Design a protein with these regions (language model features):
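Mid-domain alpha/beta scaffold segments of enzyme catalytic cores
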Residues: 1-190
């Protein structure tokens, strides 16, 4: 079994202990996903050379701010591009309002463009942003995209351009109030 989306950097335990625990649970490989600049560095320093771990690099929409130097992030990703299996976690998240909507768009589009240039897949976080998400991602039909924690309807999936779009469902499918997600899970091709 492979864990395709882990945030081990958020757990205060030694790397070897975390990966040993995963292996004991039957997880043979972990994709360690970055969400901000510190987690990109942590991935490069703690996880990049671990045999049963792959890393990503990217800025999560809730990590976007004036304090984050996008050019510096992209330069760091480029410097270590061969170590990253994907770009992300990136995307759009309007759950807490859209005060930084323009900035989220800027960071997201820059990371999609970077992924296209370097032929890397993108791990996408999308919450309460379907219309804007479609406008942006459909400009990149040639970029492989994984919609992490898919939480919308099947119409969204059908509206995606190209055939390089994948979705992952999480434990939210066990919630009775998530009917549209359960319907999507039944309809999205596996």
């Amino acid at each position: 079994m492979i864990d395709t989306h882990a945030h081990l950097h958020l757990i205060d335990r030694p790397t070897t202990e975390l990966l040993d625990s995963a292996a004991n649970a039957g997880v043979s490989h972990v994709v360690q996903v970055a969400i901000d600049l510190p987690s990109i560095y942590k991935n490069l320093n703690d996880y990049a050379f671990v045999s049963n771990c792959s890393i990503t690099g990217g800025i999560h929409p809730l990590s976007v701010s004036d304090d984050v130097d996008l050019d510096a992030v992209l330069a760091l990703l480029k410097q270590h591009i061969d170590r990253f299996v994907a770009i992300g976690e990136t995307g759009l998240d309007y759950k807490y309002g859209n005060d930084n909507k323009k900035m989220q768009h800027l960071f997201f589009e820059a990371q999609l463009s970077f992924a296209r240039t370097h032929q890397k897949p993108v791990i996408i976080h999308s919450r309460h942003s379907d219309e804007d998400m479609l406008k942006i991602v459909n400009q990149y039909p040639d970029v492989k995209k994984v919609f992490h924690c898919y939480a919308t309807n099947y119409d969204f999936f059908e509206a995606l351009a190209g055939d390089l779009n994948y979705v992952s469902f999480t434990g939210m499918i066990t919630y009775a109030k998530k009917g549209k997600v359960i319907r999507s899970m039944r309809e999205v091709p596996m």
